């Protein structure tokens, strides 16, 4: 028979060797569904022929070099697939149909939907079938019924069986007899078989109801998922067949009611089941030492199996492997092709599966072949032996070998959903560049021998041994009869089926599985969860309470390299991006341990920069940690500097009680500042502490004393008005409270600490923010003013370019006429009649008798003085009141004087850049001037002329008369109304028009 074996055909590969044992396979499988009737066969053949003629090349996946007609080839392929389909069980058929439906287009899917609806209607026509189907459908979605079923499954525990076996072991009649071909069955064994049969019946019922689970029924789905861990554990203890649990996994992985999160959890338990199957296969190899069967019998035992699996990595190879899912544990043989994306296997490429011998499951006709192995040896304290080393099969089972299949159905379902465990499950220290096995050469050779022997257990066609590596060399056959170095460990407690296992019997061998070197920031996590999911949380085995063996293992570990110059750059480059530097962040350094007071040891070591020695404390109790000495640390491999530092810090831990007691007393007596107390609390908050409720003397309760000091400090800050409420102290105290909330010692008081932190945060917000330094009053140029110092006259720029001492105004307008001051206001001359006039009366114009150095410069020198106009000059006041008026004006000007006067000098005449450079201004104080116009010269001033003095004397009588009329016996300043700004501007403009003539 010829047919295509392309990679796209999912059904046609790996079938050639099954013609000899097809009858035995079909009888062993016992398919529950009936074969198609003759009518259906005729319809199928007609449809096949029609499809063949309708399509010129119906076999798109066939080899184009074939010479047979396409219609005959397609018919043969359909016949082959149909024959295979009849040999499969319901679960295998469902998985295959599910895989094929995903490859169809939408029209074909709709056609199949209509066909399925029609078939369901026809099949439900009979009353008996309808009634049974309805009952199963109702029970499959009834949470109450499912819960009762789960409780019944959990009720059958092996403890009752163990008691029955122990009670019946003393009876002579119950002793088994192996002298003949038959064995006397004891009452305990009958109970055992009844127990196993009941659990198996429940699993069969679950297997029938699980496909009928409706999407959206979360309550029923949760019960199905709850059954999985219990069933996997029973499989590891060889209570239920492995095939039933695998079929349940297959349905769950492809069921539309299962979400992605549910599949992740199922993937974890699937890996546990995979590890058990591989350990069982390893146990089958080890039975050669205890049972010493003939190698030919072991190789020939596969002839009783249900079929063989092709090692081709195409989708068809895995599909053919699914045909023997109910009874085979057949590994891949011969070739080493790569796996496809559609049907990738779940087993790692470095691990081998062994063929399951038919009828070898606890003597009940099917199941795992590792009956003589202690089932609890495979899972020691939750840590499987396959997870104690790297992915290169650290137990030495098969260092070299072709990839194998755990089971075709589970592999197919897992690969279709993209949860193939090959990538994640192979995670080891190889990502860190440290995958170096410390096996002896003899051990490595033994592992190679085991792999060769395991590859010979699964034949290709009807039990024929594989041509390549099927028969081991003679020397290897002798080595197979010798126990491997770990065989005594695995088989040491075979007779103690359910007894307690010596957890530390593996320490010497586990130490041999360590790597030679590791980065200083890399920790070897041996937890099953962290090994499978590549978690970064440091998980500690709770049951490993004894730390002596752990320290012995730590002592044998070579000194790890740090990230320094001795660590070569190439090793860091080749280590990949996963350097695990994030493992030692404060949020990740946590211990899940039962040792009270040791959960915070990671943060404490991180604060000391000694977190590379975190493995030293993972199984240590609080009391053992306090008894560590420097000599002990050096004896277990800690460096001298680190051991000295760690010993000093441990000695300080013993002094915490005295320190807290002293701080408490000093705070109550007022001899210690709050900042000092907060600093002491900062040094203690990260140290490991026992909970407050832990038994022990009160003086050793560090957590209680710590809370007392915190209470005193916070009460002092809240109630004492004289306490220095520093913002920095409050911030540090809030940090201490935050660390205390997450501390193991204060878990029961977290709410109180949160309330206290909230009160301190409110106090911190209500505090006055810090101001700048305030100078005392009367000091400095600003007289204690805390505001920004204002711009004064001393800082104003002078026109030194043109030789002028006048300050440059900050002009916002180009018109200089608006820059006026109090000097532009007309006020009387301060001449006293009883005193002779000074030598220079023009300096006494503004009433400042102190000379030119006391005259303030409010007016720009570019603004001319028009007070010398004889027509606009007001008459002088009476001499008796002139001096009083001058004093008042001086006081007024001093109040408005923001710019102290500078000493005046008489610079040479120079031009200014105002009024189109037509005004020549002389330096010094402004005086009454007479404007004399000369052509070509602009405006000139005649200072000190006799004409100016004469005009001034002639105007004095007129000014006196006008002043007497306005004053009426009162001073002119008191009676004269104040002029507005607009009036002053208009007056200045009028004076400007009178005295200036522009060309």
Curated annotation (Swiss-Prot):
Low complexity bias: start-end ranges? 321-338
Q: Name one GO biological process term.
A: nuclear-transcribed mRNA poly(A) tail shortening
The record's InterPro entries line, in alphabetical order, gives: ARM-type_fold (IPR016024), PHAT_dom (IPR015327), PHAT_dom_sf (IPR037093), SAM (IPR001660), SAM/pointed_sf (IPR013761), SMAUG/VTS1_RNA-bind (IPR050897), Smaug_SAM (IPR037634)
* Main subcellular location of this protein, as a coarse class: cytoplasm
Where does the protein end up? Answer: Cytoplasm
List UniProt keywords, sorted A-Z: Cytoplasm, Developmental protein, Phosphoprotein, Repressor, RNA-binding, Translation regulation
Supply the domain comment.
Answer: The SAM domain mediates the association with the 3'-UTR of specific mRNAs.
The record's region (Interaction with cup) falls at 583-763
State where composition is biased (Polar residues): 1-37, 801-822, 854-864
Region Disordered: list its residue ranges. 1-45, 50-69, 321-370, 773-892
Q: Give residue ranges for domain SAM.
A: 600-654
Q: Name one GO molecular function term.
A: mRNA binding
Q: What is this protein called?
A: Protein Smaug
Q: How does it assemble?
A: Interacts with oskar (osk). Binds to the 3'-UTR of nos. Interacts with cup, which in turn recruits eIF4-E, leading to an indirect interaction between smg and eIF4-E that prevents mRNA translation.
Query: Record's Gene Ontology CC terms?
Result: cytoplasm; P-body
The role this protein plays is:
Translation regulator that binds to the 3'-UTR of specific mRNAs such as nanos (nos) and prevent their translation. Prevents translation of unlocalized nos in the bulk cytoplasm via the recruitment of cup.
Per its UniProt record, what CDD domains does this chain match?
Answer: SAM_Smaug
């Amino acid at each position: 028979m010829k047919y295509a074996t392309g990679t796209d055909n999912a059904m046609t590969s790996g079938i050639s060797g099954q013609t000899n044992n097809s009858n035995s396979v079909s009888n062993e499988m016992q398919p529950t569904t009936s074969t198609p009737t003759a009518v259906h066969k005729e319809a199928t053949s007609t449809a096949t022929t029609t499809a063949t003629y309708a399509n010129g090349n119906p076999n798109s996946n066939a080899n184009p070099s074939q010479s047979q007609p396409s219609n005959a080839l397609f018919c043969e392929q359909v016949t082959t697939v149909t024959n295979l389909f009849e040999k499969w069980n319901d679960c295998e058929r469902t998985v295959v149909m599910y895989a094929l439906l995903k490859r169809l287009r939408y029209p074909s899917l709709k056609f199949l939907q209509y066909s399925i609806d029609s078939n369901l209607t026809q099949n439900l026509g009979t009353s008996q079938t309808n009634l049974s189907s309805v009952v199963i459908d109702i029970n499959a979605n009834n949470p109450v019924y499912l819960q009762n079923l789960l409780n019944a499954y959990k009720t059958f525990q092996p403890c009752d069986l163990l008691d029955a076996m122990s009670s019946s072991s003393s009876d002579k009649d119950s002793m088994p007899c192996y002298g003949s071909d038959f064995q006397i069955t004891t009452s305990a064994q009958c109970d055992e078989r009844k127990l196993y049969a009941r659990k198996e019946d429940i699993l069969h019922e679950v297997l029938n109801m699980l496909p009928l689970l409706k999407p959206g029924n979360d309550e029923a789905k949760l019960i199905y998922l709850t059954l999985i861990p219990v069933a996997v554990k029973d499989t590891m203890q060889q209570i239920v067949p492995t095939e039933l649990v695998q079929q349940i996994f297959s349905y769950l992985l492809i069921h539309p009611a299962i979400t992605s999160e549910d599949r992740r959890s199922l993937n974890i338990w699937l890996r546990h089941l995979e590890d058990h199957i591989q350990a069982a296969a390893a146990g089958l190899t080890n039975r050669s030492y205890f049972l010493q069967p003939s190698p030919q019998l072991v190789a020939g035992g596969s002839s009783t199996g249900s079929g063989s699996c092709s090692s081709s990595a195409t989708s068809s190879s895995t599909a053919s492997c699914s045909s023997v899912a109910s009874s085979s544990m057949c590994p891949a043989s011969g070739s080493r092709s790569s796996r496809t994306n559609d049907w990738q296997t779940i087993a790692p490429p470095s691990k081998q599966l062994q063929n399951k011998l038919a009828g070898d499951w606890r003597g009940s006709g099917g199941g795992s072949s590792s009956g003589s192995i202690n089932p609890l040896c495979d899972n020691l304290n939750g840590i499987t032996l396959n997870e104690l080393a790297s992915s290169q099969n650290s137990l030495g089972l098969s260092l070299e070998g072709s990839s194998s299949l755990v089971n075709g159905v589970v592999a197919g379902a897992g690969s279709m959903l993209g949860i193939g465990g090959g990538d994640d499950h192979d995670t080891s220290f190889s990502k860190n560049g440290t995958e170096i096995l410390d096996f002896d050469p003899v051990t490595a050779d033994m592992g190679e021998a085991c792999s060769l022997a395991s590859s010979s257990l699964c034949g290709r066609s009807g039990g024929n041994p594989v041509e390549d590596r099927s028969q081991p060399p003679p020397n290897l056959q002798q080595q197979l009869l010798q126990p491997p170095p770990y065989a005594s460990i695995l088989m040491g407690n075979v007779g103690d089926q359910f007894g307690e296992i010596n957890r530390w019997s593996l320490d010497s061998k586990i130490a041999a599985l360590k790597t030679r070197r590791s980065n200083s920031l890399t920790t070897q996590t041996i937890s099953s969860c962290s090994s499978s999911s590549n978690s970064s949380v440091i998980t500690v085995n709770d049951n490993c309470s004894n730390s002596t063996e752990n320290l012995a293992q730590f002592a044998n570990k070579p000194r790890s390299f740090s990230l320094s110059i001795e660590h070569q750059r190439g090793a860091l480059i080749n280590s990949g991006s996963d350097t695990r530097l994030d493992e030692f962040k404060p949020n990740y350094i946590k211990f899940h341990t039962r040792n009270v007071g040791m959960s915070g040891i990671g943060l404490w070591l991180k604060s000391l920069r000694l977190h590379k020695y975190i493995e030293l404390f993972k199984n240590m109790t609080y009391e053992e940690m306090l008894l560590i000495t420097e000599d002990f640390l050096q004896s277990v491999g800690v460096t001298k500097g680190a051991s000295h530092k760690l010993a000093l810090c441990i000695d300080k831990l013993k002094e915490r009680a005295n320190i807290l007691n002293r701080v408490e007393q000093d705070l109550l007596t007022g001899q210690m500042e709050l900042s000092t107390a907060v600093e002491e609390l900062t040094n203690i908050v990260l140290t490991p502490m026992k909970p407050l409720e832990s038994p022990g003397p009160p003086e050793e309760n560090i957590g209680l004393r710590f809370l007392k000091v915190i209470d005193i400090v916070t009460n002092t800050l809240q109630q004492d008005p004289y306490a220095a409420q520093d913002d920095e102290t409050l911030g540090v105290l809030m940090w201490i409270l935050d660390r205390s909330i997450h501390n193991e010692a204060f878990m029961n008081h977290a709410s109180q600490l949160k309330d206290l932190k909230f009160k301190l945060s409110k106090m911190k917000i209500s505090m006055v923010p810090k101001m700048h330094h305030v100078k005392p009053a009367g000091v400095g140029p600003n007289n204690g003013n805390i505001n920004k110092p204002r711009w004064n006259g001393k800082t104003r720029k002078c026109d030194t370019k043109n030789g002028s001492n006048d300050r440059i105004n900050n002009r916002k307008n180009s018109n200089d006429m608006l820059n006026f001051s109090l000097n532009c206001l007309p006020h009387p001359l301060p001449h006293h009649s009883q005193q002779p006039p000074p030598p220079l009366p023009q300096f006494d114009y503004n009433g400042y008798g102190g000379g030119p150095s006391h005259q303030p410069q409010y007016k720009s020198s570019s603004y001319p003085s028009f007070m010398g106009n004889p027509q606009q000059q007001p008459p002088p006041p009476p001499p008796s009141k002139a001096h009083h008026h001058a004093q008042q004006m001086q006081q007024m000007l001093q109040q408005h004087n923001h710019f102290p006067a500078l000493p005046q000098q008489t610079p040479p005449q120079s031009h200014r850049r105002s009024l189109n450079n037509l005004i020549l201004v002389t330096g010094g104080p402004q005086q009454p001037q007479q404007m004399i116009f000369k052509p070509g010269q602009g405006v000139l001033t005649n200072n000190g002329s006799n004409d100016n003095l004469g005009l001034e004397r002639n105007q004095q009588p007129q000014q006196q008369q006008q002043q007497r009329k306005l004053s009426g016996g009162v001073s002119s300043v008191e009676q004269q109304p104040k002029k507005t700004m607009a009036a002053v501007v208009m007056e200045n403009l009028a004076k400007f028009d009178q005295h200036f003539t522009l060309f």
